[in-house]
Amino acid sequence: ASTTLTPVSEGDDPAIAVASEAKPAAAADLSTAGAAFGEETLDWMHFSDNGASPVSRANGTAINSVRFDAGRGFSDYVALSWNDGDTEASNSGSTNGTCTPGSITISVIVTPDTKHILLYTGAWKGTNTVEVYSQGGSLIHTAQSFSGDNTSNRQLVTLNVDAEESGVLVIKINLSNEWDDGSNVSLAALAVTGNSAGTAADAD
């Protein structure tokens, strides 16, 4: 499913033009997540190893912070790999992630070169709703909600970013319509893609 939104003018705050949701492929490479759009991967973070510290892209600077209200591990997401991590240099396909019975709050620094934010997220025994806010707290976009029953519903939520100037987006993944105490929303990974400002200079 996809939702088209007229960009919201909020001074220098970035706007979200389109949000789409789709079943993720059985496997994906976070290091090359931007290739599907003809872009570079600017940053990524993976919440792996059943609740252990997350693995980040080495030298990544776009993902400012990620906070789970309360987290526990799971191991049934699609296989996500990488080859440019910091604390774990490479992984051939981790299916782990972190889930919470509350909400997940993500802060991402965006610039005019930022084009997409990819959320590898899910829901189990409840409903997942992704909301995007400006740095000042204004709601910019609400993605289409999706629900999971006794089988986890895994989705790749893609946010198309339109930022005229640098700023911050705050993304919240919220749980609602809980079935029982085990209901949760999850985040296995996220990636930020776009055009690297230093590409041309680095090529010289």
Show the residue positions of the predicted features.
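Contiguous ligand/interfacial binding patches
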Residues: 99, 122-195
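Extended extracellular/luminal ectodomain segments enriched in beta-structured repeat modules
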Residues: 110-118, 166
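Non-catalytic accessory regions used for complex assembly or targeting
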Residues: 11-27, 46-51, 55, 103, ...
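Boundary/junction segments of secreted and surface-exposed precursor proteins
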Residues: 2-51, 197-204
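Surface-exposed, low-complexity/disordered Ser/Thr/Gly/Pro/Asn-rich loops and linkers
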Residues: 61-107
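Generic recognition of flexible, low-complexity loop/linker segments
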Residues: 104-108, 118, 158-159
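Short beta-strand/loop motifs in extracellular/secreted proteins, especially
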Residues: 78, 102-104, 115, 126-130
